[in-house]
Amino acid sequence: MVAALAGVSRATVSRVVNSSPKVTPQIAEVVNNAIAQLNYVPNRAARSLASRRTQAIALVVPESTAKLFTDPYLASVIQGIALALADTEYTLNMLISSDTRAEKTRRYLLGGNVDGALVVSHHSGDQSFGHLGQSLPVVFGGRPLLPGESSSYFVDVDNAAGAAGATAHILSTGRRQIATIAGPQDMPPGVDRLNGWRRTLAMHGLDQSLVEYGDFTPLSGAAAMRRLLDRGRPIDGLFVANDQMAAGAYSVIYERGLTIPGDIAVAGFDDNYFGATSTPPLTTVHQPSHELGAMMAEILMALIEGKPAPRVTLLPTTLLVRASTG
């Protein structure tokens, strides 16, 4: 009735009710006048009963709160999700699910509390979430690792290609003893970025044994760099699986009296403030994390509404060359 009185579509009324910035002030005034005239009050509960939808979407983050609130990648993805949902009627419920709470989270998701779920930072051990797609619409941020998840919907970047490009760039500077600090091997980015590094070195017939692992934090990057240097083998290039670990590696390189890029050319992955504020600024692989989050939300809304959506969406990366590689 509001739409008819205001002479606009129901979608426009919905945007006005949800304070969407896409509605002009003039249209908003007309709709608000109609709402006042009809004494209309949006009733989410009634709409949920009629449509059998909750108008709620769960954002599941299988990480500790410490990592969630310090990781710029997760922050960017979540921001992309939130902005994509801002002009819709969906509310976003964030569920921070540690190992001990995974089953509780799964029960909540399957209890009719949400219309769908977005899962970011997925680990292969998170089996409680691996088969959710059989019961409700789910979109993962990152390709699944478990065989049972092969039919899942996911959005990812081409991690292997990005890592391969960064490694090839280090090679182009004349470096040949190229090490890597890889990410967790129970996460798709950790696996794929390591494979990209290996693939590039294999193409040039170079040694692939200079590998240490971290958990995407600066402290783990520093520890991995110490282990690499303690081997006593020459290293003149380093690809690090994310910028946070690269920042940790920087500190150890300087601690040992070495220079960047004079002694070791360094490249990272992510393109966040850790790399941009390093000295020298870090060559890194830019991944469109904000766009990734937005795409996850768009695909999930399409699935909820019964519209066709791609199962696999792979976004490109871009190499940003800075002073850390010469």
Residue ranges and their predicted role:
Residues 37, 83-88, 135-140, 145-326:
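Bacterial carbohydrate/catabolite-sensing allosteric modules
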